[in-house]
Design a protein with these regions (language model features):
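Transmembrane helix-loop-helix
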Residues: 55-77
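Membrane-interface helix termini and inter-helical loops of multi-pass transporters
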Residues: 123-135
């Protein structure tokens, strides 16, 4: 049984999954090793695919979610590949690597938002999602999780990159 109920919470859940997969479940070692190792790059892509899988399919009807899921996984890997190559080409140029980090994250989140709207991912949700949506504080919980996850890892990485950028600009 499919319930039709548009909700923006789906996009928040996808963004949570993105930040979990791109930061929390990607160790510092993996983040550095994927720059020079196809195996580590594929490991990161697999982690991302798995986290996104458990974020989208329990909540959005499979037939509506499968194409956006594939596009997200492919585009995420492609954007990461481009970023790795840009960072390699401009190794040591902190301005470029800082901008590539920012653009990487903006593009990933923008793709999630565009695909959410393009494929109307909030229109055909699952029975499980409709049941969870009835919890009195579900929306607040999702928003609090999103804020917490952004403040936990992505912000720490962003601040670290700002300090590296500033210290290199002063030298």
């Amino acid at each position: 049984k499919v319930f039709k109920r548009g909700t923006v919470m789906i996009i928040y859940i996808l963004v949570i999954a993105h930040f979990l997969a791109d930061f929390t479940f990607q160790s510092t070692r993996l983040a550095y090793c994927k720059l020079n190792s196809n195996r580590d790059f594929l490991c990161h892509a697999s982690i991302y695919a798995f986290i996104l899988l458990i974020a989208i399919f329990p909540f959005v009807k499979f037939s509506r979610a499968i194409i956006p899921y594939i596009i997200i996984i492919i585009s995420h890997s492609f954007i990461d590949w481009i970023r790795i190559n840009v960072d390699k080409k401009f190794k040591g140029k902190q301005t470029i690597t800082f901008i590539s980090f920012i653009m990487d994250q903006i593009l990933h989140v923008l793709i999630l938002i565009v695909l959410y709207h393009a494929f109307n991912l909030g229109v055909e949700t699952t029975e499980l999602y409709c049941l969870i949506q009835q919890w009195p504080y579900f929306n607040n919980l999702v928003i609090y999780c999103l804020v917490f996850i952004i403040l936990w890892d992505p912000t720490a990485v962003f601040i670290k990159k700002i300090f590296i950028y500033i210290s290199n600009e002063n030298n």
